[in-house]
Amino acid sequence: MKCGVRGSDTVEERAVPQGNVPGERYSPTQPFSVDMPSIGNQTLKESDMWGATAFDQLMCRIAFKGLRHEGVYTPPGLDPALQFPGSLGGMNWGSVSVDPTNSYMFVNDMRLGLANYMIPRDKIAAGASGIEMGVVPQTGTPFGAMRQRFLSAVGIPCQAPPFGTMSAIDLKTKKLMWQVPVGTVKDTGPMGIRMGLPIPIGMPTLGASLSTQSGLLFFAGTQDFYLRAFDSGNGNEIWKARLPVGSQSGPMTVSDPR
């Protein structure tokens, strides 16, 4: 990293859950960065289940109790399991941005779970495409897979918000400086209905951020249609502008050769 400091100095191998798929080989450990903050990959509990109403919260609690969830690195198996974060990514969709002057790193994350299980080859229905959610054929392997986003009956994540945040890490101290939810339900909502409300609950984020030497952090990868600027020192939103559609990529700058 070209800011005069290192990222994680210590990587530790830790024991992780083992799967139950016949013929599969599982690593007994996985690497963990032990001296850097952990962002958005907590082990979920039944009490973390949430809903827009008491009904869908109850349905999420019932669904959670029917899933095997052993925290990060929960492997798929023959029984339904919950991976959190899911395959859409945690803090790795849009990568990070770095302020090399102050040695700050900025990370946006996506907190969406994925429920899945493996299906023996002879039990996969003909015509499965693997497009979007549902059955993934995994042709040429002994098993296919069923995958579904861990959402409530009205189409919102089952765990309590925030569903996406922006975080700042001081690379000199390796401490979390600040973390704020990003994104509102203005352009989305239950059952795909736009709520039009600027409630900052923190939505799943896509794209990446852009940090500048002037102390600004730009970001547009939220579920509402805004380009935002944050104070990189404290995470306060200091400006935003409406976009015609949502953004799934990172902002960029240009330099005037004059």
Regions found by a protein language model. Give the residues of each.
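Noncatalytic, solvent-exposed loop/strand surfaces
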Residues: 1-258
